[in-house]
């Protein structure tokens, strides 16, 4: 089982795979590693900062999960309260599990 940390600035905690952009995340989830391992948790920031030009802010990854029928446990660690509200709406709409 793997844990994914998606954030442009804050380093991943020990035991997580650190991904910095939406495009990098898509490549990972489409790779043999992403397809063949159980994802225990996707821990997401909202604001992609300098990495936004590589696929947008991280809410775009939730949109992509929805489009591709993916369902992973998700934790939100953003400091952006509006961003968290917007991401939480996508999580609730899809019936995904939010880990707090």
Per-region residue spans from a language model:
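Catalytic phosphate/metal-binding cores of nucleic-acid and nucleotide-processing enzymes, i.e., regions
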Residues: 1-100
